[in-house]
A protein has these predicted regions:
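N-terminal catalytic scaffold of extracellular/periplasmic and nuclease hydrolases
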Residues: 22-172, 176-198, 202-203, 304, ...
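Structural motif
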Residues: 34, 161-162, 206-208, 276-280, ...
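Bacterial N-terminal signal peptides that target proteins for export
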Residues: 1-9
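Active-site proximal loops enriched in glycine and acidic residues that flank catalytic Cys/His/Asp
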Residues: 279-283, 288, 300, 324-337, ...
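Phosphate/oxyanion-binding active-site loops and adjacent basic polyanion-contact surfaces
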Residues: 142, 252-260, 299-303, 380
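Bacterial N-terminal signal peptides
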Residues: 9-17
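Functional cores that coordinate and move charged inorganic groups
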Residues: 154-159, 166, 170-249, 253, ...
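Active-site His/acidic residue clusters
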Residues: 131-136, 212-222, 229-247, 260-264, ...
Length: 389
């Protein structure tokens, strides 16, 4: 009799648990901030954490996972294929951008968000036509088709975008002025940083000089790349001579955090349907290609300032998810034995190209628990889509 009573009680508890699970609602996610560190592996994150005296944004209680970064045809992805995986949830061949291995157009998470009535935005410290941002709106079989990519940008439907690359929009072989096209489509177009900062427009594109979006290091080294890999713009920027070393060291770059804050302000205005904002720090990759320890740490410091600002935003907006990851790792970066006495970790690099090592995933805010464990790069946009539907 006692055994029967216990069995009945256990079954009753099971019924209640099952019923409860059946009525559980998924976390409500209205807004998504997608922060991508191009080339940012665990070595880059470690270099930041060990260099700082106070807690970084990476240490502010995120849900942590790891992501495989393979492309469709190689263990080591390039930026076009890596960006495509993070944007569309589909792996493609190296060199391909926004299309599958057969060259068919893919639909990015930004496009899907637009179909749901959400606003969308892009902020990058490189050109708007570079591989990662382009993966969210374009479809081409080569990243070198920058004029085609710029033309596709005019059809992207994003509400706000800030980056560089004006030549791709106006100094074109087809003689088109794509800034005029954007204006015809209802955008305000700004070509200076001051105008971007001071605008109250609800729909704008800022196409700025490269010097405004990135203060780069002065040296004469040529960016290196592994055999078979083309030298990316980020590596060229990281090795260019736009500013002196003294300028770079004395004036921390604030572009990414200020441009991100501006985009958040625009996307949040009178917006009940939510938004997705993609932000990329592209130059981490460049310093990895150049095996430049000092530059990598400084770029990670800018990334962290932006990250901490975004964490503050989601803490004030509880229906917002922040996902931080990388398209791949660059440089084979690790922490060396030397440097402890000086309080500055010494980095060691194993390559001047990309590697196929797993990259970190940090998630904060609403729905963050979905991003724990080991996952594929394609899982990340799929998880985001599931949470916002």
């Amino acid at each position: 009799m006692k055994k029967n009573v216990l069995t009945s009680a256990a079954m009753l508890v099971l019924v209640f648990i099952t019923a409860g699970c059946g009525t559980m609602r998924k976390t409500e996610v209205n807004n998504v901030i997608y922060l991508i560190g191009d080339g940012m592996g665990l070595g880059a994150v470690s270099s930041l954490i060990l260099s700082e005296n106070s807690a970084t944004g990476f240490e502010q209680d995120p849900v942590i996972g790891l992501s495989e970064t393979c492309s469709a045809n190689n263990y080591v992805t390039d930026s076009p294929a890596g960006g495509t995986a993070l944007a569309t949830g589909t792996r493609t061949n190296n060199g391909y951008l926004g299309v599958d291995p057969e060259g068919r157009q893919l639909t990015s998470i930004l496009r899907k968000a637009q179909d749901m009535g959400k606003k969308t935005g892009i902020v990058v410290n490189t050109t708007l036509t570079e591989a990662t941002p382009a993966a969210f709106y374009a479809g081409v079989t080569s990243r070198k088709k920058t004029f085609d990519i710029a033309k596709q940008f005019t059809e992207s439907g994003v509400d706000v975008a800030v980056g560089a690359g004006l030549d791709h929009f106006i100094n074109r072989p087809d003689s088109l002025d794509l800034t005029a096209t954007l204006i015809e489509k209802g955008y305000d177009v700004y070509l200076s940083w001051e105008k971007v900062l001071n605008t109250d427009s609800d729909k704008f594109v800022g196409i700025l000089p490269l010097a405004d979006v990135h203060r780069s290091k002065s040296d004469n080294e040529t960016a290196g790349a592994a055999e078979g890999q083309e030298v990316c713009l980020a590596a060229q920027l990281a090795a260019s001579a736009e500013d002196t070393d003294a300028t770079r060291l004395s004036e921390p770059t604030v572009y990414l955090e200020k441009a991100s804050a501006k985009a958040l302000d625009v996307l949040s205005r009178d917006n009940k349907d939510g938004f997705i904002l993609m932000i990329e720090s592209a130059i981490i990759d460049g310093y990895g290609h150049n095996n430049d320890q000092e530059g990598m740490v400084e770029e990670m410091q800018e990334f962290d300032r932006t990250l901490r600002q975004l964490i503050a935003y989601i803490n004030e907006h509880p229906k917002t998810l922040l996902v931080v990851t990388a398209d791949h790792e660059t440089g084979g970066t690790g922490i060396n034995y030397t440097g402890y006495e000086s309080g500055k970790p010494s980095l060691i690099f194993s390559t001047k190209g990309h590697t196929g090592t797993l990259v970190p995933v940090f998630a904060y805010g609403a729905g963050a628990e979905a991003f724990s464990g080991i996952m594929k790069n394609t899982d990340i946009p799929e998880k985001i889509e599931e949470l916002i539907r």
